[in-house]
Structure formats: structure tokens, C-alpha cells
Amino acid sequence: MCDIEKTLGNPCNYVFCFDRIQAQAYRNQGFDTVYHLPLGINAKRYENIRLSSEQRSKYGSQVSFIGSLYEGQYPAITEISTDYAKGYMDAVINSQLQLYGAYILNDVIDKRFVEAMNKHFKELQPDTKFQLDKAALVHVLDQETSRRERLLLLNLLGSRFDTKLYSRQDYSVFRGVQCMG
């Protein structure tokens, strides 16, 4: 059992995910104390904020994105994977990107695939203690899927609207997206 299964399987732990599909996937696996909770704000607090015209010019935009683009472990995993595994994982991610409202990652990553990856890792480095489990690999693919989706959306929005990105990472490669830090 991996750490995430221990955490989610503990009946004392209540977990709230802002990602509805991820929360449902965990519930489908039998973790009954995982719930979807959209990110919220205190609207009344923001109603009272008054900006100068200089601040409005600096921070105002038609679209603002605040947050991480999920720089996860996918590049590190694919770097040491077989060409077949890389191609399969890319195909799975690209398929998931096309299926809004459906979640396939947990169904298309099976035990044999994970075992084959672990066997390959062991062949590369016989002394390695690195072992992937299905939940960890699916999580890595979830993050990469979200990252690619956010990159696509930011590129699209930046090409059509005044768009600002607030993130710790530097993404100055986007055309039409102003990185605000």
C-alpha cells in the first residue's frame, strides 16, 4: 500500500480536492472521505478594495491565471522509460485531453504496465530501490495532463485576450501572456 492509499484510507482523514474528476476517481476506488470542494474566495472582502488607476493598469486584465502549471515528475519518469512506455503514456495523456467529463487514466494504466516499467528501471540500475506503484504513476499522469491542458488554455487565451499569469515559475514563452511573477 502506498502513502496516498494509507492517507486516504484512514477514516479519520477527510480530504477535499478542488479537482472534481480526481475526487470522484478516489471515491470510485473506495475512499469515502474524499470530497470535491471548489476553490472559493471572500467576495465581500474584495468588493471593498479600491485600486488606483496605476494599480488597475498594472494588474487589470481580461483574463488572469493564478497558480501552478504543475511541473511534476513526468519528465524525470519518461527520461528513464522505454520508448514504448513513453509513447504509451503520451498517447494516454493526449486521449485524456480529448475526453472532457470522462476519466480514463486509472483504467488504462494496469499492473502489467507498471511492473514492466519497474523491471526496466531495475535493468537500468540494478541497485535501485525506486519502485512505482499504479497510484503514483496515475498521479504523475494526472499532473502532466493538467499541465498540458493549462498550457493549451493559456496559449489560446493569450492569443485572444489580455492575459496575465501569476505563478512562481517563469513562462515567458507564451505569446500574449504577461508573466507577473
Regions of interest found by a model, annotated:
Residues 29-181:
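Nucleotide-sugar donor-binding catalytic core of glycosyltransferases
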Residues 4-15:
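A conserved, positively charged/aromatic
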Residues 15-32, 152:
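A short, active-site helix/loop in glycosyltransferases that binds the activated sugar's phosphate group
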